[in-house]
Amino acid sequence: MGVVHHANYLRWFEMGRVAYLKEADVYLNPLMEEGIVFPITDVSCKYRSSGRFDDEIVIETVAEAITPVKMIFNYTVRRLADGAVLATGRTQNVFTNKEGKIIRLPAKYYDKLAQLAAIDAADR
């Protein structure tokens, strides 16, 4: 069939989210070493056009909200060749400890994410 499986879009959202964190100088390993995880509590995806196996894609990730207890991101997945929107989506993560209790993200991480989100908001 040659069409990308629908679950791959959620993986691409994750890739976009991780890239966003890195852009803010927030890396997964130090968070996990401190016992901070951020499970998905809500996800949505609207499929706009079929992606094909050989398509090169671009994932646009924009912070809708960054608070000390949660992150909400919006995504647009585009085909590089023609700019066609393949999917749009949204995720919400909450910050928890390893036992699943909601926690506040330490300021050393939150401040970096909030600063990048503010820059993004100003650019829109």
Predicted features along the sequence, with ranges:
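Terminal targeting signals and extreme-terminal segments of soluble enzymes
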Residues: 1-58, 66-124
